[in-house]
């Protein structure tokens, strides 16, 4: 009888990562859709390029900087209501971006959307980790792929809605996000049952935080973020400048990158069952260095596209297991670990991107991409460090 109860409980827990994935889709639909609203703001509201760039920066900074704070709140007391409020604010913020007239109110609305995004990630990732049971990397993979689905759907929804209804079409995000916020709110009691850290012990490890080990994983995740931003920012421009590719054709490269990245994220949980996270990280960074070099040296558009496919797989295949490992290193601060992994690591990529852009302006895009290859080599060094930490832990265990 008790065996049936355990099986039923596991079944309910196994559904929770998909429910959390839905929340992740909602907040990243809003964040992904913001960029596609910008051209309409320039044309219909008369904002300058500088003003709309500041708009995106305000949203991203608000999201990235405040995420660890919400993670710390979750470490002190389980607050699953943060997710429902976060989904509601993410949708409300971008909905108001299209209807407000004052520029500074639009900036404030973008920041509200970013804060909503920040509210979901730490608590959602913490609960995905706890709901994962013995297969935490799979649970994190399910949660993470929601973000990529959201980023893919956001631009489609924004363009379709604003084209059909004008800037007030952004109100569609209320219809998307508010109902799901209510779903998450209704499930708060079930989420509360996991507590702050869950009831189980960490297999093969003590329960003390290991900040040094966490920092090494965070270094690898930060490198991943910089390379990710670099690929999406510079690779289409490189194809246009080097091979005279049409701008719309070069932009399709990002679609290919997104599709293969989503496939890799969805496969990450299965990969982690066969390959330990440190080995997966090492393999991905080795292929990353090779792919970046191949992109520059190939001399063929199609080989460049193939290199981008491999890069997309490498950048996303190791990410959910690495985030789960980072959380495992901070068992007493799961929310903080989640906030740093999803917030600060991503912010590093956003901060580095303009610096790489300045290098591209002064020394050429190829130089910027070679820097990405060097950074990927640094990511390999971080990954080797993680593997060494795991070996030491195994010997002590």
Over which residues does each language-model region extend?
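Helix-loop-helix hairpin linking two adjacent transmembrane segments in secondary transporters
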Residues: 143-190
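Conserved MFS/SLC helix-loop-helix module at the cytosolic interface between two early adjacent transmembrane helices
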Residues: 65-101
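Extracytoplasmic gate region of multi-pass secondary transporters
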Residues: 34-35, 212-262
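Structural signature of the two symmetry-related core transmembrane helices
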Residues: 81-95, 279-293, 373
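C-terminal transmembrane helical hairpin of 12-TM major facilitator-type secondary transporters
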Residues: 276-322
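Helix-to-loop junctions at the C-terminal end of transmembrane segments
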Residues: 66-78, 264-276, 360-361
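Residue-level signature of mid-helix packing/kink "hotspots" within the transmembrane helices
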Residues: 32, 60-68, 151-152, 258-266, ...
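Cytoplasmic helix-loop-helix junction between adjacent transmembrane helices
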Residues: 109-146
